[in-house]
Design a protein with these regions (language model features):
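Short aromatic-glycine-(Arg/Gly/Cys) micro-motifs in beta-strand/loop hairpins
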Residues: 1-16, 43-44, 49, 57
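Acidic interaction surfaces
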Residues: 8-23, 63-68
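Short, flexible N-terminal segments of the mature chain
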Residues: 17-35
């Protein structure tokens, strides 16, 4: 499995950070982005959001498998 951290700022939009092998590594890496208004951990293999914090407008969220786009 691989995970990615995606952050969101209303002024700059979304930004992708790193590739992590485990969800635990991704949660540790997320601590680096505490100052960001919103952040999430995205499972790249299953196309699912596994953790989300902060406000995300609908257009800024990544696509999830099994959800209507």
């Amino acid at each position: 499995m691989s995970y990615e951290i995606i952050t969101y700022d209303p002024d700059t939009g979304t930004d992708e950070h790193g590739d992590y092998r485990t969800q635990r590594e991704a949660r540790q890496g997320l601590k680096l982005y505490r100052q960001e208004p919103a952040a999430l951990i995205y499972d790249l293999d299953r196309w699912r959001i596994v953790y989300r914090r902060g406000y995300w407008p609908a257009g800024a969220l990544p696509i999830e498998r099994g959800c209507n786009a």
